[in-house]
Amino acid sequence: VKKLMDNVTRKAEDRGKIRTLGGRACHFDLWQPVQFGIFKPLPLEEARDEYDEPLKRAFTYKALNKLIQGSAADMTKKSMVALYKEGIIPHIQIHDEVDISTESPKQVENIIEIMESAVKLEVPNKVDHEEGDNWGKIK
């Protein structure tokens, strides 16, 4: 994980952006002084005018989180599109959870298969599910 974090942070610092698994760009467009202190991150030209010292990109420490959370969002969205194409319409999606009414255990299995295969990864993506009479009764 440390190696991945260092690699992603370095890309954010060097390129000013990283890409999620779905290809969306997460930008790091603000700059701040290299020296530790309380500085307001600014666009590059403003930072050059404001701070008379070497600059670095701001918030690159958030790159790994943006990669993970952004990729999870991409995967959830692809899963929802795949479900929709099969005529399965989720009621609500919150973060990485999807609420769906089902008619049978076979349909539950089908939904899990669709969601697990929506994004091809080297390590298989597993979908957990919980069932209940209504959303409020699921623990």
Feature map (PLM): residue ranges:
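Conserved catalytic core of nucleotide polymerization and phosphodiester-bond processing enzymes
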Residues: 1-139
